[in-house]
Amino acid sequence: MQVTVEKPETGLEHKINVTLPAGDLDSKVEQRLAQMRRTVKMDGFRPGKVPMSVVKKRYGGQVRQEMMGETVQQSFYDAVAKESLNIAGYPQFQELDEKDGHIVYSATFEVFPEVELPKFSSLKVETVTSEVTDKDVEKMVTRLREQKMAWKPANGNKKAKEGDQVIIDFVGKKDGEEFEGGKAEEVPLELGSGRMIPGFEDGIIGMKKNEEKTIEVTFPEDYQSDELKGQTVTFDITVHSVQTKVLPEIDEEFVKSFGIEEGTEEALVNEIRSNMEKELKRSVENKNRTAVLDALAEKVEVELPQAMVDQEASALMERQLEQFQQQGLKAEDIGLTAEAFKPEAEKRVKIGLVLGEVIKEYKIEATDEARQAFIQDQASSYEDPQEVIEWYAKNPQAQKEIDAILVEKEITNKILSEAKTKEVSKSFEEIVSPAA
């Protein structure tokens, strides 16, 4: 095999030219056809007795094409290994030809860039700290009660306010004529939920049971119906009932409904606090890890392999499409392109390259002890921890994902021990449920 490499003065793209004997390919084709002959079935012949000439005539072209692909792929990776080239992404093959008893082809590809790490002491990182307060726990208890709340009809004189639920009929009209989809009966609507177009729920506030009213609203410019977007219409509203929230008492039945067999309010509060503290710990670690990696990547100037960026952008787009499709949206209606995900893809590829260099330079790896401790911590949040532990034991890919988390954690700790840090205290809500 003859190999020549064309290296640019700048940039990551290389070109490799390869020449190899076609005899190797001929030999592989003969071997594959001989294997096929043993099992191939054709009318008029017993299994395994089809003449080789017939097998060649029927399958020779297809097999040669398959063997050519395998040969080119294998020889390419042998060639780049011989030249000590560390390729990034997939190669593009060109100029494939057979002549004078040789297979000749070229391939262009990118190589991984050299990454020069900054001194960690030069980094400035803003980290967050937080704690679960009694008020946070009280809010969570209230949310749990709201999950199991009931609606109770109020007396006939009560005026509907935000947070109440009304049972209504409505008829929508445009220029005095009813429009399609604008009419419904006995609809439950929580005021302030934002379910309806702007102004609709506000127009019902202050109404009482059996009251009728006509309100005027304007559909948003981005409304899905072309006939209605931006149009001002009226709705005839009839209120059948005004209902208020009734929260359940924190009694034994309520507590046990969350799987807490003690059935006491104290046990519920302790369980909630424990879960919130675990969630907060994970969120703080994630935010601080992200801050560290962003600060590190910002200090590094490196050319990114475009093939890796394109692959990452496509993967991000596919992931987003899957989420939209799970919501019932059609891919063709969404109009997503990989180009829209390029900035995020570039950031991820850059962080990946920098992390790889840190791992290599400082010989960082996940230990078995750390992996087992991580699994134990994850399992403790489940009803049957042993089942979770056994699941991880049977899933090597899940263990690799844990190793990646642990390595990033060790890198984060190492950088934080040397970098200039500024600690900012934030509330549980700010950390766990930041505003969009």
Swiss-Prot record:
Function: Involved in protein export. Acts as a chaperone by maintaining the newly synthesized protein in an open conformation. Functions as a peptidyl-prolyl cis-trans isomerase.
GO biological process: 'de novo' cotranslational protein folding; cell division; chaperone-mediated protein folding; protein transport; protein unfolding
PROSITE patterns with a match to the protein in the record: FKBP_PPIASE (PS50059)
Annotated EC: 5.2.1.8
UniProt entry tagged with the keyword Chaperone: yes
First-tier enzyme category under EC: isomerase
Family statement: Belongs to the FKBP-type PPIase family. Tig subfamily.
Main location: cytoplasm
Description of its domains: Consists of 3 domains; the N-terminus binds the ribosome, the middle domain has PPIase activity, while the C-terminus has intrinsic chaperone activity on its own.
One Pfam family in the UniProt entry: Trigger_N
GO MF annotation terms: peptidyl-prolyl cis-trans isomerase activity; protein folding chaperone; ribosome binding
Source organism: Hydrogenovibrio crunogenus (strain DSM 25203 / XCL-2) (Thiomicrospira crunogena)
Gene Ontology CC: cytoplasm
Cellular location(s): Cytoplasm
Protein name in UniProt: Trigger factor
Swiss-Prot/TrEMBL keywords: Cell cycle, Cell division, Chaperone, Cytoplasm, Isomerase, Rotamase
Domain PPIase FKBP-type residue range list: 163-248
Keyword Phosphoprotein carried by entry: no
Catalysed conversion reaction: [protein]-peptidylproline (omega=180) = [protein]-peptidylproline (omega=0)
